[in-house]
């Protein structure tokens, strides 16, 4: 798919894309209780999660209603994913808690991602692994209710272990610092507690005392990280937008912190009663921000930093190298195509803002990374541009291009 983007001014109201992080967690909750998700958007990552719980015995009706099995067991000995890193990393400890043997494989983007920390951790507790990357055969059953794991590679392992210890009727997790993307662990903890469980997270330790979980029926709330590209599009194009279907931002740093970050850079950016109001200003300020706890915000911040006055610095970026693409390199390449200079350091990237009238009108390949396409499309709204392999947005937000059209973006889809 090729998308041609012409200079446009974004305006209007848009519903935030459903949070795939929350959707995947809700789908995995169907291992314990009935879940009915209204109007579920079937992104590629969500489909990976659905296929995973189906392989563990969950009855799935119309890809929206999920009924837990009487007994959890591995129904399929081979689980094939597409590209959902969240699903993969949560699934590994879950199948280890259920016990048995299963082989997991996925597309090349996931095969490149390391699984070292979860393999190291669970190998100490009765689990055998064929390798530390995909394809991966897992054999055995967790032999301990008290797990130690390094927290530097992925928070998704810890989220998966919270599910695993609910399967084992309780236990504890000790996370060896540093703890990356802590906000996503807090999301999992909050979700279980909201459903009636008893999960405590103090310092670097999590204690799980399961209770029966209540059923859920409703719609998946919006995703601040994905919605931020609509906000970025408005700010770069000199427009305004209102984004609905978002929960109130939490106190801890996470994807929702983008509301505050954009405001600090000079934009009108306010949350009120479930709506995020965004309006462009004539100029934006540079910023220094650590995104280790919310790495998915990197491309949105980089996009606005491209036209901010002065030099911005995004730190805590080390794990961006193991996303759908090497996102550090992807940010550098995309900015360069639009005529924006940047400099990569050991754990940060400097972005040298320019006047937006100086932005180029390039052809950008999305590099099989949905966020590359979204960042580039926002920049292209200023002076135009072309996105190739633009179907990559289907990984997280299949409606992205239609949403831009509804916000008065001038684009053609080939």
From Swiss-Prot:
GO molecular function: 3-phosphoshikimate 1-carboxyvinyltransferase activity
Chain sites annotated for binding phosphoenolpyruvate: 20, 85, 113, 156, 327, 371, 395
EC class of the enzyme, as a word: transferase
Database matches in InterPro entries: Enolpyruvate_Tfrase_dom, Enolpyruvate_Tfrase_sf, EPSP_synthase, EPSP_synthase_CS, RNA3'P_cycl/enolpyr_Trfase_a/b
EC nos: 2.5.1.19
Keywords from the UniProt entry: Amino-acid biosynthesis, Aromatic amino acid biosynthesis, Cytoplasm, Transferase
GO biological process: amino acid biosynthetic process; aromatic amino acid family biosynthetic process; chorismate biosynthetic process
Annotated metabolic or biological route of this protein: Metabolic intermediate biosynthesis; chorismate biosynthesis
Domain of life: Archaea
Record GO cellular component, one term: cytoplasm
Annotated SUPFAM superfamilies: EPT/RTPC-like
Broad class of where this protein is predominantly found: cytoplasm
Residues annotated to bind 3-phosphoshikimate: 20-21, 25, 154-156, 181, 296, 323
Homology family: Belongs to the EPSP synthase family.
UniProt cross-references to HAMAP family, sorted A to Z: EPSP_synth
Self-association state and partner proteins as the record states: Monomer.
Function: Catalyzes the transfer of the enolpyruvyl moiety of phosphoenolpyruvate (PEP) to the 5-hydroxyl of shikimate-3-phosphate (S3P) to produce enolpyruvyl shikimate-3-phosphate and inorganic phosphate.
Protein name: 3-phosphoshikimate 1-carboxyvinyltransferase
Organism lineage: Archaea, Thermoproteota, Thermoprotei, Sulfolobales, Sulfolobaceae
Name of encoding gene: aroA
